[in-house]
């Protein structure tokens, strides 16, 4: 029995040894495979190396959802302010806790929240009836096209309203019910940008410096000295303004429009505004003088600290002093492009912002295009322009401004107008303006 046992020891030892070697070999294979992931084996193929380098150089976003477009089909059943029957779009009933309600809506719609901080909605409009000026409707169409062009370049949404939302708030007061309703209809936007129908974007590349206004809720073109010290009603212009979509703005507009024609104190406010602003021409209470009054008399900084009076660029500019400068400005821009080949490069319209940003460094010491040319007093729709202006100056000025702006759009399509008072266009040669 002892001999039988000794004869079977050797095969068992060999079998165990084979299993050990097989296991060790498998472990080595696994270790080698793991190391190949942690410490990549150098690749001698230059083509593969080039591809790998290119992939590593791509800056993929940490949060891919942040780069996706808003989901227009997502509206969960969660209750929001829209489901509250007490919520009113009109200015007759104050809105409360708007910041919290807007924030809650954005939490339920996260695809909108990623870009909400800088999102702008441009709002403009005109009266419900046709224009009495024979060319008025044509001019309003061209003014609107100009705004659509600007919004398309910068990916802004735009609303054109021609409905009177409050029967008593007409003329210059008509815009405030529209702005109030737009804020509620668009909780995804941070800013609402009102631009009068008779205002033209004449620098299509320029973007609002929103960081400059991060601590403010209302931006208006104006000068504090003229408003607070001189008490001039033209110390600011309320035809173009940027207002934040927040509770402060809703409360401020409630105070602002309390001087409007829908209130029983309307006539008294007209008298008070004329007493405060001796240069006021209009007898009635108007929104521009009302805003100036709130700024000039706000000694406790109830509102003033959140209002930014912009005077460093043409947030909106007086047309009479601007329209005669277009040709000289165009020549200055052409001069820069002759020196900088990159600015002359043809490109898709969708990437126009890149070239606008590139141009900025060459405009620091030069006069840039006026951002917005505002035809105050020209009344393109009814034709009843300010008697201080010549009618032809108004109509020719509008034509020049619209064509000056349109040239900036047409260039991307390979055309331009040589004469700002001529509607005909010509193809641009390759390499323009150096060609």
Swiss-Prot record:
GO CC annotations on file: endosome; Golgi membrane; trans-Golgi network
Positions glycosylated per UniProt: 230, 328
GO molecular function terms attached to this record: galactosyltransferase activity
Gene3D superfamilies recorded: Spore Coat Polysaccharide Biosynthesis Protein SpsA, Chain A
UniProt keyword terms in alphabetical order: Cell wall biogenesis/degradation, Coiled coil, Glycoprotein, Glycosyltransferase, Golgi apparatus, Membrane, Signal-anchor, Transferase, Transmembrane, Transmembrane helix
PANTHER family named among the record's database cross-references: ALPHA-6-GALACTOSYLTRANSFERASE (PTHR31311:SF26), XYLOGLUCAN 6-XYLOSYLTRANSFERASE 5-RELATED-RELATED (PTHR31311)
Stated family: Belongs to the glycosyltransferase 34 family.
Stated name of the protein: Galactomannan galactosyltransferase 1
Organism, scientific name: Cyamopsis tetragonoloba
């Amino acid at each position: 029995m002892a001999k039988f046992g000794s004869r079977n020891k050797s095969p068992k030892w060999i079998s165990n040894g084979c299993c050990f070697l097989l296991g060790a070999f498998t472990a080595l294979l696994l270790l080698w495979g793991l190391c190949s992931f942690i410490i990549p084996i150098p690749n001698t193929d230059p083509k593969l190396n080039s591809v790998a380098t290119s992939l590593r150089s791509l800056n993929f976003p940490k949060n891919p959802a942040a780069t996706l477009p808003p989901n227009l089909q997502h509206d969960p059943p969660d209750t929001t302010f829209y489901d509250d029957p007490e919520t009113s779009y009109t200015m007759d009933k104050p809105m409360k806790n708007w910041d919290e309600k807007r924030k809650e809506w954005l939490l339920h719609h996260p695809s909108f929240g990623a870009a909400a901080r800088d999102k702008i909605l441009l709002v403009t409009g005109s009266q419900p009836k046709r224009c009495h000026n024979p060319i008025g409707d044509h001019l309003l169409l061209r003014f609107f096209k100009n705004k659509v062009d600007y919004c398309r370049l910068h990916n802004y949404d735009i609303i054109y309203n021609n409905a009177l939302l409050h029967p008593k708030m007409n003329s210059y007061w008509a815009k405030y019910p529209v702005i109030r309703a737009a804020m509620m209809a668009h909780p995804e936007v941070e800013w609402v940008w009102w631009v009068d129908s008779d205002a033209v974007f004449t620098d299509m590349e320029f973007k609002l410096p929103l960081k400059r206004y991060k601590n403010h809720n209302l931006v208006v073109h104006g000068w504090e000295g003229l408003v607070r010290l001189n008490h001039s009603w033209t110390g600011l212009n309320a035809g173009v303004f940027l207002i934040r979509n927040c509770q402060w703005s809703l409360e401020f507009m409630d105070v602002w429009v309390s001087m409007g024609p829908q209130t029983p104190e309307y006539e008294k406010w007209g008298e008070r505004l004329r007493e405060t602003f001796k240069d006021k021409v209009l007898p009635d209470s108007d929104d521009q003088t009302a805003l100036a009054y709130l700024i000039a008399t706000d000694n406790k900084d109830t509102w003033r600290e959140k209002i930014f009076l912009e005077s460093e660029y043409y947030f909106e500019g007086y047309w009479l002093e601007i329209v005669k400068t277009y040709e000289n400005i165009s020549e200055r821009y052409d001069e820069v492009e002759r020196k900088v080949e990159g600015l002359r490069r043809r490109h898709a319209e969708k990437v126009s912002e890149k070239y606008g940003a590139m141009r900025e460094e060459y405009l620091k010491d030069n006069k840039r295009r006026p951002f917005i040319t505002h035809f105050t007093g020209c009344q393109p729709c009814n034709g009843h322009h300010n008697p201080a202006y010549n009618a032809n100056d108004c109509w020719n000025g509008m034509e020049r401004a619209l064509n000056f702006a349109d040239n900036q759009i047409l260039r991307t399509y390979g055309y331009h107008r040589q004469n700002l008072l001529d509607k005909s266009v010509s193809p641009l040669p390759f390499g323009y303006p150096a060609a």
